[in-house]
Amino acid sequence: MSDAVHWTLEVSVNDGQLSTFKDLLNEMVSSTRSEYGTSIYEWYFNEDESICIINERYRDSRAAMMHLQAFGSFAERFMAAVTPTSFIVLGNPSTEVRDGLSGLNPRYLKLESGFSR
């Protein structure tokens, strides 16, 4: 089984916050680019840019926890710009990671079968 931890967070962009949010996401992408064990870090918008889906994958729980610690410096601005609407975590994250994510009320799904290359 894989040790990888994935998550997909869907957020609604708060009124008047799109420009601020896009500036913030660029800061976050730049910061995350150098983090240990981050293999996917992608931000997607719908056509009118009112909804964003953030797709993330980490090598293991250690890498996910390192990202959560780094996110702390962005959290206040992030939560002021958006409202989380759905959060799905895939894999088997550690208790520490689960505790770090608990404020977003995630749904957890475990890997049953398959592979990635």
For the regions a protein language model found, what residue spans apply to each?
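A short, acidic, amphipathic alpha-helical segment used as a generic capping/interface helix at domain edges
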Residues: 72-76
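Short S/T/G/P-rich N-terminal loop/turn motif that feeds into the first structured element of a domain
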Residues: 1-52, 59-70, 80-117
